[in-house]
Amino acid sequence: MAIIPKNYARLESGYREKALKIYPWVCGRCSREFVYSNLRELTVHHIDHDHTNNPEDGSNWELLCLYCHDHEHSKYTEADQYGTTVIAGEDAQKDVGEAKYNPFADLKAMMNKKK
């Protein structure tokens, strides 16, 4: 686990303030819009997961709501547990495809079946 520096809050406020000035207050995944009153729920995600990589142009930052940020980091936890590969910004379920089986496909016939 990474060691959190003592001045982390100061570092975070620096890049957070910059990111909020650069990007619109919208979650990069779910497109939820934010206003000043709920801005604390909008977080800055480091795309490469390196919190020391803070370029002035914001190219390593992405604004995510709390829920999407948790989801993004949970993919890496699952990858560590199950040995899968995760590409930053991509959904782990992307290649799985849609479900093929429909349990209700023949429901009407099953309900009309006489005993």
From Swiss-Prot:
Belongs to the HNH nuclease family. The gene is yajD. It comes from Escherichia coli (strain K12). One of its GO terms (cellular component) is cytosol. This is Putative HNH nuclease YajD. It is an enzyme of class 3 (hydrolase). Residues 27-75 form the HNH domain. Its EC number is 3.1.-.-. Keywords: Hydrolase, Nuclease. One of its GO terms (molecular function) is nucleic acid binding. InterPro entries: HNH, HNH_nuc. It comes from the Bacteria.
